[in-house]
Amino acid sequence: MNEEKKRKNIFFTFPRTFWIANLMEFFERGAYYGLNSVLAVYLVDVLGFRQQSVGLLQSIVYALTYILPIFGGALGDRLGYRKILLVAFSLLTIGYFAAGNFDTYGLIFLSLLIMATGSGLFKPLITGTVARTTTKENSGFGFGVYYWSINLGAFLAPFFVSWIKGFNWRYVFFSSALWCFLMLLPAAFVYKDPERPENVKPLRKVLKEAMLVLSDSRFMLLIIVYSTFWILYFQMFGSVLWYLRDFIYRAPVDAFMQRIPILRPFKFDAEFVTIINAGTIVLLVVLVSRITKNLKAFPVMAVGIFIGLCGFVVLAFTHSAWMFILGIAVFSIGEMTAHPKYYSYIGLVAPQDKKAVYMGYAFLYGVFGSLIGSNLGAVLYERNMAPIAPPAEAVVSGVPLSPDAFSQVRSFWLIFAALGILCLAGMLLYDRFFSEDTPKTNLRAWRIMLGIYVIITAVGVYFLILSLFLSPQVQWRTLVQSLIMLAFGGGGVLISLRSKT
């Protein structure tokens, strides 16, 4: 009886700050995913930017949202979560609003970088709040509420985007700015800082821990291998959206959904990719979590990666709208299966005395996944898919693709399926040869990572020469890509060599 009463009253075991934090998470993620569900289409179709330019923009913006949480958490601990939340929501509001008012590439890029800075500062503050406002008894449920607020925001916001973009595309940006502006009110007047830890890390220690993690070749090898799967994920915000627009005959889905009165008029557009992804997770995450709860981390990860790449195989062999939906849903099931167990696996392979530190850097997969995925998808789409895209009238009429065009489409998606296979094979090899923290595995990983860093540096040098000296004029996009590769590759070489001295 007491246990039943406890379960009924679990909602009342959380302080008000916990619920305010989740409300903020819901609206911030709604603003973020609402805009990004259509951003790639808007930049290409409305503003006329090239796919490759959009890919570069997205890669840097998305990567920044994964890098900055390192500093956002440290600043929150030192200055107080409430102050940094006010800064974060101010930057988010300014970034979204400014991006909606500009139509030149550079200014939109700058505006979205401001947005990404706000998002990166915001992320660790909410997870920190949830962690500090829950107890051992209710933390599992508390983090469940947190994850639901993320996916529910990502699921519902694109429905609003589907409606409001019909009036004016800029309203999508303005609505995202509005959601973040409104969150300034609870941040300023309702939210209270959770109790701070007794020992607040100075920024110097945060940077020292970052160097410790980045110099661990065995850990970085795991990040690199797993980030290959996230190359597939970031197609959901670029190439998948363009493919839906350019190749998919959507009338059957439109006709079916029109039968639901509340959805009339219905048009299956880009934003529904995010709706399918987030909706699949919202509907099935509890079931998948229960099935995998007591299973070992690595086998579940491997199965999830395999399911995810099968979603891209589905995209490769049909351009039916229903099969397109199935492909996105299958990938989403793979994502929700693999990703939670990834964090469990990090806890197993990290040095046991530094597990908490390493868990704080597990998100680095998103940096590499976005930098490679957004650029690769955009380059391949512009070169291989855009030239064979049929006229819009043919797509609307459902005219089948020619055998040659269908073959190219199949090859395009099979490239990403192959990357999924590469990730799966890499994870199997990693678990077999690198999962234990021994001098032998560390030395082997150090040699591999040094080789990877050298290759990236060499490619960066080639891109630099290509952009400055082998082209009639400076290729700014290639120049930026070369600088990123030189920073990552060269920095990796220096860190690796320093760790051996």
Language-model segments: which ranges?
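Central cavity-lining transmembrane alpha-helices of secondary-active solute carriers
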Residues: 56-74, 275-288, 368
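Conserved MFS/SLC helix-loop-helix module at the cytosolic interface between two early adjacent transmembrane helices
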Residues: 67-103
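Intracellular juxtamembrane helix-capping segments at the cytosolic ends
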Residues: 121-135, 337-351
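Glycine-rich segments within core transmembrane alpha-helices of 12-TM secondary carriers
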Residues: 140-165, 179-183, 362-377
